[in-house]
C-alpha cells in the first residue's frame, strides 16, 4: 500500500512568514516534474504488471492519485522519498472516490488506460485549480473517434469499447490532457492512430518515452503530429521522470527578483528556453555549464517586456504569475496576455496589495514597474499564484505573510527547505496544533 506521509499543516490560517530583502546563493536541486509524474502514474495502468517510477516528488496531488489508483485495485507503494512502485495487475472498474477525484484534475487521465485495457471506464468529472473551464470535450471526442461509446451522466463520464480502433484525430486545440489521454488509449488500440494538432509539451514527450519503455510504438512525440501503432499488451518498466521545468522557472524568478546568483540542477535546457529567453531580454545572464545545470546571474536593473502565454514551445501559462512578479519591479511598462486559461489573474490584486501597479482588462494585464514591493498579508488563489506571492515576498521590503498553502503543497516539494538552503528567511507558521487530515 502507498505509505502516506502526513503533509505539512495547511489550515486556512496556516501561512508562510517571509522576511524579504535577503540575497540567495548556492545550488538548488530540482525535483521530478509533478505534471509528468501524475500522467505516468495513470499510464502505469496500461500494463498488468509492476512499474517503478523514479524522481516522483512526495506531493499532495501524488498522494491523492495514489489513493484513487488503490480504489481501482492497484497496489501503490512508496519506495523512499522519490520513487513509487505501481502494480496494476488487479486493475478493476470500481468508481474512484469522488471526494478525491473532485480535488484532482489529473484523475481523469485514468479514463484512457481503463477503457483501453478493460473495455470500460467510469470516471467522475475532475477538479483541481480553479483557473478556467479546462473542459474534457476533446478527450471525449477523441475516444468516440476510436470507437468508444461515451456518456456523461450525473457528473460521471462512462466510456465503453470492446476494442478501441485506430483512427485519425484532429484536436481543435493542442490540449496537453487530451493528447496524453488519447495517446495512452491508442497504445492498446487495434491499428494505427494519428493525433493531429497534438500538444508538444515536454511532459507529452516524457509520457511517450515511458510508454515506449513499456513496449508501445509511438512516433512523433514533441511535434504536432503523433502516430501510435497499437500493440496487444504492454509490460512494466522502471523509468525516471524528467526534471520539473516549472519548479526550475520558479527558482530562476526567485533569484531574479532578489538579484541573486544561483545554480539549478538537474534541468533540461531546452525545456527552459521560453523563460530563459525572456529573462535574458530583461537583462539577466543565464548560462548552461553542462547539459543538466543552469547558472543564473541577475541584472542590476530589469527592463520591461511583454509576455504572451502560449502552448509549448511558447511561454508557459504556469510561469505567467511568477514572471509578473518580476515585471512589477522592472523599469518601464509591460503587457501580459493570458491566452491559455481564463481566470488566471487571481494574483494581481494581491501583488497590488504589496505595492505593484497592475491593471487587468479581459485577458490582458498592464504593468507599470515600481521601485520595490512592500510586505503584506496576501492569499494565493491557485498553485502558481501562491508560488508567485512567495517569490514576491522574498523581494519585498519587510514581512510578508502568504496564505493559501494548500495550493502550494499541491505542486512544490520541500520549497521552504530549498529556499532556506539558498539563504531565504521564511518559515511556515501554524497557529493551531491540530493537524490537517492525512491525504
UniProtKB/Swiss-Prot annotation:
Give, as one word, the top-level EC class.
Answer: transferase
Localization per Swiss-Prot or TrEMBL: Cytoplasm
Task: Name the GO terms of the biological process aspect.
Answer: cell division; cell wall organization; peptidoglycan biosynthetic process; regulation of cell shape; UDP-N-acetylgalactosamine biosynthetic process
Annotated phosphoenolpyruvate binding sites: 34-35
Q: Which residues bind UDP-N-acetyl-alpha-D-glucosamine per the record?
A: 105, 134-138, 318, 340
Molecular function GO terms recorded: UDP-N-acetylglucosamine 1-carboxyvinyltransferase activity
Q: So what family is this one in?
A: Belongs to the EPSP synthase family. MurA subfamily.
- Quote the PANTHER family the UniProt record gives: UDP-N-ACETYLGLUCOSAMINE 1-CARBOXYVINYLTRANSFERASE
Which named protein is this? UDP-N-acetylglucosamine 1-carboxyvinyltransferase
What species was this sequence derived from?
A: Thermosynechococcus vestitus (strain NIES-2133 / IAM M-273 / BP-1)
Name of the encoding gene: murA
Amino acid at each position: 500500500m502507498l505509505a502516506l506521509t502526513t503533509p505539512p499543516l495547511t489550515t486556512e490560517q496556516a501561512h508562510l512568514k517571509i522576511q524579504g530583502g535577503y540575497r540567495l546563493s548556492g545550488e538548488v536541486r530540482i525535483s521530478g516534474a509533478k505534471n509528468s509524474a501524475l500522467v505516468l502514474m495513470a499510464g502505469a495502468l496500461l500494463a498488468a504488471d509492476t512499474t517503478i517510477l523514479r524522481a516522483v516528488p512526495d506531493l499532495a496531488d501524488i498522494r491523492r492519485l495514489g489513493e484513487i489508483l488503490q480504489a481501482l485495485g492497484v497496489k501503490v507503494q512508496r519506495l523512499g522519498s522519490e520513487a513509487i512502485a505501481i502494480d496494476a495487475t488487479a486493475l478493476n472498474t470500481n468508481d474512484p472516490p469522488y471526494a478525491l477525484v473532485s480535488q484532482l484534475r489529473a484523475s481523469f487521465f485514468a479514463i484512457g488506460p481503463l477503457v483501453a485495457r478493460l473495455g470500460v471506464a467510469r470516471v467522475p468529472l475532475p477538479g483541481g485549480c480553479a483557473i478556467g473551464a479546462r473542459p474534457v470535450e476533446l478527450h471525449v471526442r477523441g475516444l468516440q473517434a476510436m470507437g468508444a461509446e461515451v456518456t456523461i451522466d450525473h457528473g460521471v463520464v462512462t466510456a465503453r469499447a470492446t476494442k478501441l480502433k485506430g483512427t485519425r484525430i484532429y484536436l481543435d486545440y493542442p490540449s496537453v490532457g487530451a493528447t496524453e489521454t488519447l495517446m495512452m488509449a491508442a497504445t492498446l488500440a487495434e491499428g494505427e492512430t494519428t493525433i493531429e494538432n497534438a500538444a508538444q509539451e515536454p511532459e507529452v514527450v516524457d509520457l511517450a518515452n515511458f510508454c515506449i519503455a513499456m513496449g508501445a510504438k509511438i512516433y512523433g512525440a514533441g511535434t504536432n503530429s503523433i502516430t501510435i501503432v497499437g500493440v496487444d499488451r504492454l509490460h512494466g518498466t522502471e523509468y525516471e521522470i524528467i526534471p520539473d521545468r516549472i519548479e526550475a522557472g520558479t527558482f530562476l524568478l526567485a533569484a531574479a527578483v532578489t538579484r541573486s546568483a544561483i545554480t539549478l540542477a538537474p534541468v533540461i535546457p531546452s525545456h527552459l528556453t521560453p523563460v530563459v529567453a525572456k529573462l535574458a531580454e530583461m537583462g539577466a545572464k543565464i548560462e548552461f555549464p553542462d547539459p543538466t545545470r543552469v547558472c543564473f546571474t541577475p541584472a542590476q536593473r530589469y527592463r520591461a517586456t511583454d509576455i504572451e502565454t502560449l502552448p509549448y514551445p511558447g511561454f508557459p501559462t504556469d510561469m505567467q504569475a511568477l514572471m509578473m512578479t518580476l515585471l512589477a519591479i522592472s523599469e518601464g511598462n509591460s503587457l501580459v496576455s493570458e491566452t491559455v486559461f481564463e481566470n488566471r489573474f487571481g494574483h494581481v490584486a494581491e501583488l497590488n496589495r504589496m505595492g505593484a501597479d497592475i491593471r487587468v482588462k479581459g485577458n490582458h494585464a498592464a504593468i507599470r514597474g515600481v521601485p520595490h514591493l512592500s510586505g503584506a498579508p496576501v492569499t494565493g488563489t491557485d498553485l502558481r499564484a501562491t508560488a508567485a506571492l512567495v517569490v514576491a515576498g522574498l523581494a519585498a521590503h519587510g514581512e510578508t505573510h502568504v496564505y493559501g498553502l494548500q495550493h502550494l503543497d499541491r505542486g512544490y516539494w520541500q520549497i521552504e527547505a530549498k529556499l532556506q538552503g539558498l539563504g531565504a528567511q521564511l518559515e511556515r507558521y501554524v497557529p493551531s496544533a491540530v493537524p490537517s487530515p492525512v491525504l
